[in-house]
């Protein structure tokens, strides 16, 4: 009985940890409150352990799509606008001592941002170097040997190209004999970076209605106001509280993209931090996920990319391709791809945005800065069946076909599933 009780406690502990809420995750790691601005989870967290492949199977090919690493904010107004609002409050003597300090720090940050808007940071470069190092450590068979060829393609945006080059540098250090074909050309953007007029219109309508309503419902700035302003009535009557709070939250969230000690998380209590994540999570689900609000349309933006992944894998399996196809782009491309491929719970449909938080559709698990999806292909000398494993941010995820060897899946079954899905979409 004693041993049974101990085992039960261990089971409950594991289950509780596996089902940890976003609220609890944010309490333990405030970076997660940044949502899509969250930096890559390692080395803050322990890198997940990988399940050994079935006996006799060895990795031979990798197919990948990754988001650029941590960056500066992509609009100068994200730095200047909150300064202007705080200067107005300061002019009337309405800032607290902490508010005055924040204004000073924001001015310093804005000066540092000059000429670097949207660019990769030192943190972002380091993320990709370490990702590549773990690729070669986890799957040396793919990258070892004198005839290894790696094809890398990037969005034409500089931060993506530099993310690619930081990984390439580490791959070449692991195997100086490998051939790396690196390219960032408009010729590949038809499948690497995507969007269309329908998606833009659906997003515009959702922002104006459902997302706006969700944001307003979860906007409770009391603690923030008390930290920043000495006159609550002035702040409510004379300032755009929603705008200033959201602007400072953006900067706060993105400070983890820099090697800096400056932090503004103390301006927000636990509820405000959580609601920032909640709003961002809902935003991404609607504008790039399978949300009914946007007609379930957004994942289909990734169809050309998925087709490229299938075709590239066919070539590699037939011995006519390369050892690895690495693609570097953006969060707005990675999110639809993961949803289209139905990895983990990211293909699930939720009719009520309030249900998202209790699910496992969490944006910080999907697209942090430096986020990436890796498909690892395995073969055995004793079987013709190719197996594949999906890693999202180096964590094993389920795939949408049955398997007795999960997280390893039959590529034949997966390929047929995805081909059928792409064909059905054409009708």
Give the label of every model feature segment.
Residues 1-22:
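Bacterial Sec-dependent N-terminal signal peptides
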């Amino acid at each position: 009985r004693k041993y049974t009780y101990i085992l039960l406690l261990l089971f409950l502990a594991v289950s509780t940890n596996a089902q940890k809420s976003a609220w609890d995750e944010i309490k333990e790691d405030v970076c997660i409150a940044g949502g899509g601005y969250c930096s890559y989870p390692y080395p803050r967290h322990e890198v997940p352990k990988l399940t050994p492949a079935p006996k006799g199977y060895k990795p031979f090919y990798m197919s990948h799509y990754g988001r650029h690493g941590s960056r500066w904010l992509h609009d100068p107004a994200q730095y200047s606008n909150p300064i202007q609002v705080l200067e107005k409050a300061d002019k009337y003597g309405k800032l607290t001592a902490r508010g005055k300090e924040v204004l000073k720090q924001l001015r310093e940050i804005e000066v540092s941002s000059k000429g670097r808007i949207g660019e990769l940071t030192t943190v972002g470069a380091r993320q990709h170097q370490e990702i590549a190092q773990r690729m070669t450590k986890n799957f040396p068979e793919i990258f070892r040997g004198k005839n290894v060829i790696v094809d890398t393609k990037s969005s034409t945006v500089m931060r993506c190209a530099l993310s690619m080059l930081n990984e390439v540098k580490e791959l070449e250090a692991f195997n100086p004999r490998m051939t790396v074909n690196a390219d960032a050309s408009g010729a590949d953007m038809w499948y690497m970076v995507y969007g269309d007029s329908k998606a833009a219109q659906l997003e515009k309508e959702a922002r104006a209605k459902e997302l706006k309503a969700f944001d307003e419902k979860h906007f409770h700035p009391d603690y923030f106001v008390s930290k920043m302003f000495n006159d609550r009535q002035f702040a409510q009557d004379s300032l755009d509280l929603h705008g200033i709070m959201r602007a400072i939250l953006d900067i706060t969230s993105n400070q983890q993209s820099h090697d800096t000690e400056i932090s503004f998380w103390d301006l927000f209590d636990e509820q405000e931090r959580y609601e920032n994540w909640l709003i961002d999570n809902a935003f991404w689900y609607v504008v790039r996920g399978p949300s009914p609000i946007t007609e379930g349309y957004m994942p289909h933006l990734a169809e050309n990319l998925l087709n490229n992944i299938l075709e590239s894998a066919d070539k590699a399996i037939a011995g006519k391709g390369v050892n690895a196809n690495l693609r570097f782009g953006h969060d707005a491309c990675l999110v639809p791809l993961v949803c289209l491929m139905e990895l983990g719970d990211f293909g699930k449909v939720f009719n009520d945005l309030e249900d998202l938080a209790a699910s496992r559709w969490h944006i910080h698990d999907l697209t942090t800065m430096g986020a990436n999806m890796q498909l690892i292909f395995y073969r055995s000398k004793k079987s013709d069946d190719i197996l594949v494993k999906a890693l999202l941010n180096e964590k094993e995820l389920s795939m949408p076909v049955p398997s007795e060897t999960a997280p390893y899946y039959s590529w034949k079954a997966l390929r047929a599933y995805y081909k059928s899905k792409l064909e059905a979409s054409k009708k």
